[in-house]
Amino acid sequence: MSAKSIREYDGKAVLAYWLNRSPSISKEEYKTVSATPAVQLAQIQFPLPTLVIPAESTTYREVVEDVFAKVEQEHPWVKETKLVAKPDQLIKRRGKSGLLKLNATWDEAKEWIRERAGKNQKVQHAVGYLTTFLVEPFVPHPPNTEYYININSVREGDWILFCNEGGVDVGDVDAKARKLLVPVRLSEFPSRATIASTLLSDIPVEQHESLVDFIIRLYSVYVDCQFTYLEINPLVVIPTAKGADVFYLDLAAKLDQTAEFECGAKWAVARAPESLGIKTSGEESGAINADHGPPMVFPAPFGRELSKEEAYVQGLDAKTGASLKLTILNAEGRVWNLVAGGGASVVYADAVAVNGAADELANYGEYSGAPTDGQTYEYAKTVLDLMTRGEPRADGKVLFIGGGIANFTSPAVTFRAIARALGDYKDKLHAHKVSIWVRRAGPNYQEGLRVIREAGKKFDLPLKVYGPECHISGIVPMGLGKAPVEAEWQMA
């Protein structure tokens, strides 16, 4: 599982499309009819400002107005109803941060967005550009109709939390909420009576049927579309003659990215223009194919925009069952890691910090899960390219190629790919005076170490090679000049 946050726009689109389409998890029949209104969600995205085109420039302001004009064309309803406007960039507690515009006309919403588009915004300790907004209809309601619901996955199953208080001042929901654990075996899904008695004991009885149906439908989508986390706050429940109308006003969600091969088409069709009622200028067929729609986007956390290289590795990672991760911490740093294994990557980063070079640690990342030769080669090239940019440093740079004891990843395969990448960048590695320190163990590790050592000799690279006789992070103090250099591994 790889739980990744998604935008509120995407979460609401998936939920709206599949709420009445996903097969019910419950063996009992629904008691109420779920009337799904037309989906009205407008995603407004602006480009990142640059040094050439800053947010205050006339050119950027013109881009903003062009985006607004496109929104009016695709979503004519924005001019016909009161609206809610808010950034959609994985920002928590937007209401508390003044990042929520309520009960606004389209002109008022535009002005509010206009003042913030492309501008730097500080939210707690994070600072980032506001470039993506969500606009949707405002739902008037009294405060006492706001509730809270959360579904999250744990080893034992899925927890459903429900609280009869919701909104920005909900407080400690973990302490307040009533909780129900849905077992991993969905054949043991709780009965309607259990759901009502466990979660809804503080809710008027006349609303139970509508809310139980909504909870079952919500959980069915959660399972069907491979969510790992889903929070709605507030969930507005407005009493009616037939029970209640339910509205999900604010939503935070995570999907299992590794389920894209299974659910990618479901995520895509829910966000296709036809599903969202978007008026397009081209020919409209009205038909929605199973594989029609845009691929899911997993944005970086607010204040942490992905670099081109990070996005490239993320793309590689999304296309494989292996794991390829890269985060640039300090592009000017002296110490770089090319490490196999999530656990080993933490150990190496920690060892660098313990040896007094935390401020020089350039990247954090890992490759694991038996990536192919081509995937490892592309990953290694990306790291080496980043490492050898800019002006060479007088003190040179250090590259640690390491890992623990591999289980099913073959060091022989991955090291052949890394050796090819070293050959591609041999001139730049020499120019930047890069010393290379290798430690690896696991199946066929001898062949892997032999290949990497021969590459060092072939390309005349300053490269030291160690096997399992060296502690997993034992080469770090040696590479940083904090410990004597020990004898290298020798082929038996």
From Swiss-Prot:
Entry's Gene Ontology molecular function annotations: ATP binding; ATP citrate synthase activity
Record's catalysed reaction(s): oxaloacetate + acetyl-CoA + ADP + phosphate = citrate + ATP + CoA
GO terms (BP aspect): acetyl-CoA biosynthetic process; citrate metabolic process; fatty acid biosynthetic process
Gene3D superfamilies listed in its UniProt record: 3.30.470.110, Succinyl-CoA synthetase domains
Location relative to the cell: Cytoplasm; Nucleus
Coiled-coil ranges per UniProt: none
N-terminal signal peptide: none
Main location: cytoplasm
EC identifiers of the protein: 2.3.3.8
Stored Pfam families: Citrate_bind, Citrate_synth_N
GO cellular component: cytosol; nucleus
Ribonucleoprotein in keyword set: no
Enzyme class: transferase
PROSITE patterns assigned: SUCCINYL_COA_LIG_3 (PS01217)
Record keywords, A-Z: Acyltransferase, ATP-binding, Cytoplasm, Lipid biosynthesis, Lipid metabolism, Nucleotide-binding, Nucleus, Phosphoprotein, Transferase
Residue positions, PTM Phosphoserine: S24
Subunit: Composed of two subunits.
Function, as annotated: ATP citrate-lyase is the primary enzyme responsible for the synthesis of cytosolic acetyl-CoA. Has a central role in de novo lipid synthesis.
PANTHER family: SUCCINATE--COA LIGASE [GDP-FORMING] SUBUNIT BETA, MITOCHONDRIAL (PTHR11815:SF10), SUCCINYL-COA SYNTHETASE BETA CHAIN (PTHR11815)
Entry's family note: In the N-terminal section; belongs to the succinate/malate CoA ligase beta subunit family. In the C-terminal section; belongs to the succinate/malate CoA ligase alpha subunit family.
Protein name: Probable ATP-citrate synthase subunit 2
Species per Swiss-Prot/TrEMBL record: Schizosaccharomyces pombe (strain 972 / ATCC 24843) (Fission yeast)
